[in-house]
Structures are given as structure tokens and as C-alpha cells.
Amino acid sequence: MQRTLVLIKPDAFERSLVAEIMGRIEKKNFKIVSMKFWSKAPRNLIEQHYKEHSEQSYFNDNCDFMVSGPIISIVYEGTDAISKIRRLQGNILTPGTIRGDLANDIRENLIHASDSEDSAVDEISIWFPETKMETDN
């Protein structure tokens, strides 16, 4: 079984889409291993999470958005969880995906999902330092 990190972003709460997003993932038979609700995530966690983008012009705006409201951090587990949840997440131009069907903006796009095994390990350690990472790959 492979583990991956998902963040449900502030716009999902603002638009009452949290259950819809989590339901789409649940219907694909992924198991929640750990979950935390953050009424306002600490900015240092957000900055650490997005550190690879720290030199980009959008970094501060993205961090501001991520601390603008509640988020949920979730560790999901399942076969090929990283690639399958990334496909389910999609992008705003791909119908049939979470972002394609529900997102309105490139930044305020409802969900983040780890894009690789290395990212999953790193991101899970940021949001769930107490969780041991186990993968099948």
C-alpha cells in the first residue's frame, strides 16, 4: 500500500465542497490513515510545504491564500495512491476531475495532492511528523 498527502484548501470550505471532494476520493477505495483539521494552518507549515516554490513570484500570494481559512490535511493509503489521487485531482481544464469539475481558479483550486513518492514522504513529515511513512514502491 502506498501513502500520499492531500490538503483540502480554504476555498473548498468557503464553497461547501469538502464532503464532495473527500467523497470522490473515498469512492475510489482509498483509506484515511491520518487526518487533521486546521482552523488556520500555521504559516510556517505552509511555507515549508511550498518551499520548492519559494523563489516564485506567486509564493507569498499562495501562502496568504492557504492561511486565509481552514484546511484539512489527510494521509490516504491505497494501491498506487499517489498517481491515482493525482489523476482524480486533475487540473481546471480536465472535466471529470475534482479541479476540472469544481475549481474556478488556478490558485484557489480546492485540493493539493502529492505528485511523487519523494514529495509524499516530505509532505507527510511536515503535516504529520508523528506518522511513519510506509509505501510499496
Swiss-Prot record:
Keyword line: ATP-binding, Kinase, Magnesium, Metal-binding, Nucleotide metabolism, Nucleotide-binding, Phosphoprotein, Transferase
SMART domains the UniProt entry points to: NDK
Catalytic activity of the protein: a 2'-deoxyribonucleoside 5'-diphosphate + ATP = a 2'-deoxyribonucleoside 5'-triphosphate + ADP; a ribonucleoside 5'-diphosphate + ATP = a ribonucleoside 5'-triphosphate + ADP
Binding-site residues, ATP: K9, Y58, R86, R99, N109
MF terms (GO), sorted A to Z: ATP binding; metal ion binding; nucleoside diphosphate kinase activity
Outcome (variant: N62L): Increased affinity for NTP and decreased affinity for dNTP
Family: Belongs to the NDK family.
Functional summary from the UniProt entry: Plays a role in the synthesis of nucleoside triphosphates. This activity may optimize the replication of the AT-rich (73%) viral genome in a thymidine-limited host environment.
Entry protein name: Nucleoside diphosphate kinase
Organism this protein belongs to: Acanthamoeba polyphaga mimivirus (APMV)
Lineage: Viruses, Varidnaviria, Bamfordvirae, Nucleocytoviricota, Megaviricetes
Gene name of this polypeptide: NDK
